[in-house]
């Protein structure tokens, strides 16, 4: 079986020639990043799909604590049987330069055994950072994209029901200070380390703003001198982000996903002439019930046993010649000519790499 579609995506996306890209697409300003927030909360208003409180004692404890804070005191030892409440973990990303009062999206995930969060409302939940300080407060109605129904032992479910989103569901209460070029310089961090790309970024910036404006510290970091004034600095960084650079050619690499059988390679992969032989080996196990019937008027019992037959099938191997290829299209054509299954192809690529015929780094994920 040939697999001409197996490498179609890699061939179409990765075979084009290198083109100019904006600096903002290939690099980020050091220190300008999002910060993760997390918190614990309760979702109420569920239609009988909440936590089973007998199996999730933390949900019951959380409800009791919340009611106590509201002035509602429950008798000691009371056993609350609730079905419309779920304990959840609330997560969000605090974007750079976020200001107090700004709204951010939050994700709400069940941590108990709730069947669905659909239709629920998150009660006010503080969101903390890694330093333990509260940076935002989250509250609002959940949006759950899934749907499900069950009756008489039958169940139908579409998508995931135990995770929901609240667009603009949290309000920022505390800002994170970001020092942006206040010392007279900033660092640009390339998303992919490459000496050629770093050198080209330096050349483009210096050509636009003058010599010695930028200098490369290593294959990833480029230091850039900035104006001291805040307004001038913002305009300067905006101009730098808009400059176009032709990234260096990526290192030849083949990525293999051993779990799904997916193979992706970039345009710099080449293949030397080589010979490949592979054959399919399959083991077929079939089981049929055999009934042992006792003789008439005998005291034996009818017994049902299983009889298994095991058969090993092996198709004869065939030696095929792979022509050397200097382009991605040639490599794809050569590998498709083998006609191997995805799992066989994983082993063939590893063998080609071991033999030195595959001119690329092989990475298994």
From Swiss-Prot:
GO terms for biological process: bacterial-type flagellum-dependent cell motility. GO terms for molecular function: structural molecule activity. Keywords: Bacterial flagellum, Periplasm, Signal. Transmembrane segments: none annotated. It comes from the Bacteria. Residues 1-20 form the signal peptide. Its main location: periplasm. It is found in: Periplasm; Bacterial flagellum basal body. GO terms for cellular component: bacterial-type flagellum basal body, distal rod, P ring; outer membrane-bounded periplasmic space. Assembles around the rod to form the L-ring and probably protects the motor/basal body from shearing forces during rotation. The basal body constitutes a major portion of the flagellar organelle and consists of four rings (L,P,S, and M) mounted on a central rod. NCBIfam families: PRK05303.1 (NF003676). Belongs to the FlgI family. This is Flagellar P-ring protein. The gene is flgI.
